[in-house]
């Protein structure tokens, strides 16, 4: 039986094996999707095993979505433009084995937003984070037509690189460690969309019971919102994070909320098709 791996750390909380294996079984594909925790310094060894083993491919999650790119023999042009890979296809031919990297996270973010038929009023967005998920979220914002993105993050050096990714988008950077609460709240109040793209709040992470947005900031920002706002949480375990709970508590009746589980399902369906060349039965 062939294998498909989920590589990352932490990954004990992942729901991907449940729906990926359900799809494989439904279509009678002889393959099993399983988690493979990769500790610091182990990535090279794991990728060597992937090349030599009976592996169809893999999903890549925190913290390897950018560093995995160095291991690829080929990267899909779209993934290159995003700057992150979350899906690997193992191509085995007479000439040898090649690892091809793709990004399905962007589709996983765009599709749930489009499905909401949400109308943009200001074309402004707030993006929290600068990691691989944030890179995908930024590309999704570009594709959706946002003209201004406020990036709020601790890694200011990484945040500065976002401005070079799309000249058509005005990017302003704010240090999460030093931004005044009133300033942070005003960014939220003016935004059409706020995306939480850090691992903060994740069940098996280092900070499972907190939000990157202080509660008073969330309250002030959402109660003073200038129009409808869509709040997108990319963390899916727990299903309702502290960030999402506060957003629901203080958002007005026109606010829209998207849970991370929706992104997981949509990006997972795209990955499934890359590995199997068949559409996932779950969507």
Give the residues covered by each predicted segment.
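Glycine-rich adenosine-cofactor-binding loop
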Residues: 8, 103-106, 113-146, 153-156
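NAD(P)-binding Rossmann-fold cofactor-contacting core
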Residues: 146-169
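Short acidic active-site motifs
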Residues: 42-46, 179-184
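Short glycine-/small-residue-rich Rossmann-like dinucleotide-binding loops
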Residues: 63, 196-200, 235-236
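Phosphate/diphosphate ligand-binding glycine-rich loop within oxidoreductases
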Residues: 2-118
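Rossmann-fold NAD(P)-binding glycine/threonine-rich loop
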Residues: 90, 208-282
């Amino acid at each position: 039986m062939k294998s498909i791996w989920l590589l990352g750390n932490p990954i004990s909380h992942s729901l991907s094996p449940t729906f990926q294996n359900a799809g494989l079984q439904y279509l009678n594909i002889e393959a099993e999707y399983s988690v493979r925790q990769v500790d610091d310094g182990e990535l090279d060894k794991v990728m060597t095993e992937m090349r030599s083993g009976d592996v169809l491919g893999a999903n890549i999650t925190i913290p390897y979505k950018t560093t995995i790119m160095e291991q690829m023999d080929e990267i899909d042009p779209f993934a290159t433009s995003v700057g992150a890979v979350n899906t690997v296809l193992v191509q085995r031919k007479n000439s040898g084995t090649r690892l091809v990297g793709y990004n399905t996270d962007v589709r996983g973010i765009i599709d749930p937003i489009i499905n909401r038929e949400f109308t943009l009023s200001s074309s402004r967005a707030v993006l929290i984070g600068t990691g691989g998920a944030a890179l995908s979220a930024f590309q999704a914002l570009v594709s959706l037509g946002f003209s201004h993105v406020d990036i709020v993050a601790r890694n200011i050096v990484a945040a500065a690189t976002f401005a070079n990714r799309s000249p058509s988008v005005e990017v302003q950077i704010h240090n999460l460690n030093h931004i005044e609460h009133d300033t942070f709240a005003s960014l939220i109040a003016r935004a059409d969309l706020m995306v939480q793209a850090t691992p903060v709040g994740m069940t098996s992470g280092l900070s499972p019971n907190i939000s990157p947005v202080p509660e008073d900031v969330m309250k002030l920002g959402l109660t003073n919102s200038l129009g409808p706002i869509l709040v997108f949480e990319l963390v899916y375990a727990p299903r309702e994070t502290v960030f999402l709970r506060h957003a629901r508590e203080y958002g007005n009746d026109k606010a829209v909320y998207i849970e991370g589980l929706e992104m997981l399902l949509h990006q997972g369906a795209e990955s499934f098709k890359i590995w199997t060349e068949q559409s996932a039965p779950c969507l």
